[in-house]
């Protein structure tokens, strides 16, 4: 009986803070979030996709201060598969990215070389930013934030 009370006490101590934290979603819009764009090159087009992606990467770095991380990685199980991983400072940074002329030129050049291009958003992204990405015609899945935090890296 004492053992049962001990277990119940432990459960109460450890589940209450988790439940409280689980109710604290981040506000959509002003917080950092992740976008993953998955690309699959047509046979024989991977090198051209890499070259075009390298060129736009430099332009995004130079012109988008709200893009905190921008990496292009190869799928380890498929030499024609790639993924952009992007961390945005906030939803406004995504809106700037979507309106970047260099991004538009990249998408126009790379799209004919692909047989797949999808996007996934993870986090507290504003409804306007999600709608703007979907308006590009890119199949997009948004995984809305349920709980968590964004560390302040300014201090």
Per-range role (PLM):
Residues 1-3:
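N-terminal secretory signal peptides that target proteins for export/translocation
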Residues 5-6, 98:
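Hydrophobic alpha-helical segments, especially transmembrane helices
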Residues 7-17:
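Bacterial N-terminal signal peptides
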Residues 21-82, 89-99, 113-155:
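Short S/T/G/P-rich N-terminal loop/turn motif that feeds into the first structured element of a domain
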Residues 105-110:
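Amphipathic alpha-helical coiled-coil segments
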């Amino acid at each position: 009986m004492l053992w049962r009370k001990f277990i119940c006490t432990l459960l109460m101590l450890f589940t209450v803070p988790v439940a409280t934290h689980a109710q604290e979603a981040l506000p959509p819009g002003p917080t950092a979030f992740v976008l993953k764009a998955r690309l699959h090159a047509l046979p024989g087009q991977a090198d051209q996709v890499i070259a075009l992606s390298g060129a736009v990467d430099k332009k995004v770095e130079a012109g988008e201060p709200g893009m905190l991380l921008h990496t292009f990685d190869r799928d380890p199980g498929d030499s024609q598969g790639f993924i952009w991983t992007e961390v945005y400072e906030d939803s406004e940074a995504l809106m700037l990215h979507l309106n970047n002329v260099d991004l538009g030129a990249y998408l126009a050049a790379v799209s004919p070389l692909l047989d797949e291009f999808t996007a996934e958003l993870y986090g507290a992204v504003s409804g306007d930013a999600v709608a703007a990405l979907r308006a590009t015609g890119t199949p997009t899945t948004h995984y809305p934030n349920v709980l968590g935090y964004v560390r302040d890296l300014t201090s």
